[in-house]
Amino acid sequence: MKMEVSFPGGKRVYSDFNGFTVETDQNEKDGGDNSAPTPSDLFFVSIGTCAGIYALNFCEKRNIDPTHVKIEVEFQANQKSNMIEKVIFNVDLAPEYPEKYISALIKSMNLCYVKKHFEQPPQFEFVTNNDVKF
């Protein structure tokens, strides 16, 4: 699995991955044009949408209307470091949602591939074209 990162101008950074070009930019206060999400935005979005696709698949397999499930993700940051310390998935279920599937729905969302990377984080290595590793 590989990704190519490019710099098309300004504070924009693009990533070509799995046949898609994902565009990012910085906010105006950080010198960008605010023309696309920031990399951090996409990071947070990936957590919510990952849990969301697991919830959607769970509902579809059981013929449950997915509009009966609303997910709101809350990120709590450390005030000094600004690092996220807690991610809370608030799952709002409509009265029509079958009670017998509540626990199973949450368990399915807990299988999120992105979330699992927090539980078992990868190692990061930087290598230059002259094989210097950092």
Question: How does the language model describe each region?
Answer:
Residues 1-45, 55-134:
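Extended beta-strand/beta-hairpin segments
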Residues 50-51:
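Alpha-helical metal-binding/catalytic segments enriched in His/Glu/Asp
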